[in-house]
Amino acid sequence: MAADQRPKADTLALRQRLISSSCRLFFPEDPVKIVRAQGQYMYDEQGAEYIDCISNVAHVGHCHPLVVQAAHEQNQVLNTNSRYLHDNIVDYAQRLSETLPEQLCVFYFLNSGSEANDLALRLARHYTGHQDVVVLDHAYHGHLSSLIDISPYKFRNLDGQKEWVHVAPLPDTYRGPYREDHPNPAMAYANEVKRVVSSAQEKGRKIAAFFAESLPSVGGQIIPPAGYFSQVAEHIRKAGGVFVADEIQVGFGRVGKHFWAFQLQGKDFVPDIVTMGKSIGNGHPVACVAATQPVARAFEATGVEYFNTFGGSPVSCAVGLAVLNVLEKEQLQDHATSVGSFLMQLLGQQKIKHPIVGDVRGVGLFIGVDLIKDEATRTPATEEAAYLVSRLKENYVLLSTDGPGRNILKFKPPMCFSLDNARQVVAKLDAILTDMEEKVRSCETLRLQP
């Protein structure tokens, strides 16, 4: 332990005294004190190494040397706001444009996903002249007041649903109303959006936007059925609204097959607005909104300047460019496909072996493991999931849960997560699940004894 480093207990005591308890820690019963990270590994104050399965912010790996170097070199020369001409912002916008459909060709740079989604909401309202938003159940789009209002995950615990917010069912084919045995779940779930829109219109409401993560994360690592977004976009645009794809958790090659998760819905589907954050800067605060020309021009026509003090700074754009360079140089998109497929295969074997594993779903390095109490009802195994995550931490694997029932193990590791990491993590998962089952059998045996 470094000589100038506080003991863990002192750090915890200071945090409890100085930092609001609403700013929560992972593993609150026994928090991990992380002092260093590299690649897909994190290290505590004692030097113990943890495999990081959840830091999708450290997209190309914690403290990637090329990203660190890019930030350092630019910071030594200039860092200022975007009101001055500078090559970095236009170079970065051009590189991003090469990854997107040509219609998405106007860019705004910001500092966080919340800022990006807030701006997307403003753009949608200016373009359409409408107010209302359709969102998916249990969605989360950010911590600003405007975004809490369109995040059922949050607003149900606060002031409740605003009259201008309309909630459609998650397109969850495992535990939603239209499941894997439905002949056309994409159409069925899209028709639910159509029904929500019609209900709003009957009340005199006008739809500005449909907001959705391209792969709902907080909702439980959901993979929407192919064709769902195209049909939703048709219903929304017919009502005069636009489609906003939130790529903050899932963009930049994480899904492997495509650079953007919305592209899983087919080459003909193009959102009107795309928001980016988290992984875009590999830990540096960067975010972006990409919009079509008509949407951007309507915003410009208001005559109101959009200015963000740090958004699009030379350092932020240098970092963003470095992340794109690493993704390309290290072929991390292909890596996500191969390692993600292998991890899905290993987790699928756990589903066969352990009844608690109800479903394994995912694409690339975005994977969810749905833990259940019984197969017939698919009741979320919430307590078991929490216990499992705690045991994995004791075995130096950092994982967390999500979903309405907090029973979905979510895998969103840095993109350098390896085949060997997959083997290690699943081996530890298997051992803990086996131990849990043996303890249950032991308790049942004791109950059966006279």
Swiss-Prot record:
PANTHER family: 5-PHOSPHOHYDROXY-L-LYSINE PHOSPHO-LYASE, PTHR45688. Its cofactor is pyridoxal 5'-phosphate. InterPro entries: Aminotrans_3, Aminotrans_3_PPA_site, PyrdxlP-dep_Trfase, PyrdxlP-dep_Trfase_major, PyrdxlP-dep_Trfase_small. GO terms for cellular component: mitochondrial matrix. Keywords: Disease variant, Lyase, Mitochondrion, Pyridoxal phosphate. The modification N6-(pyridoxal phosphate)lysine is found at K278. It is found in: Mitochondrion. PROSITE patterns: AA_TRANSFER_CLASS_3. Its main location: mitochondrion. This is 5-phosphohydroxy-L-lysine phospho-lyase. The lineage of its organism: Eukaryota, Metazoa, Chordata, Craniata, Vertebrata. One of its GO terms (molecular function) is pyridoxal phosphate binding. It is linked to Phosphohydroxylysinuria: A condition characterized by elevated phosphohydroxylysine in the urine. There is no clinical phenotype associated with this finding other than the urinary metabolites. It catalyses: (5R)-5-phosphooxy-L-lysine + H2O = (S)-2-amino-6-oxohexanoate + NH4(+) + phosphate. Its EC number is 4.2.3.134. Homotetramer. Catalyzes the pyridoxal-phosphate-dependent breakdown of 5-phosphohydroxy-L-lysine, converting it to ammonia, inorganic phosphate and 2-aminoadipate semialdehyde. It comes from the Eukaryota. Belongs to the class-III pyridoxal-phosphate-dependent aminotransferase family.
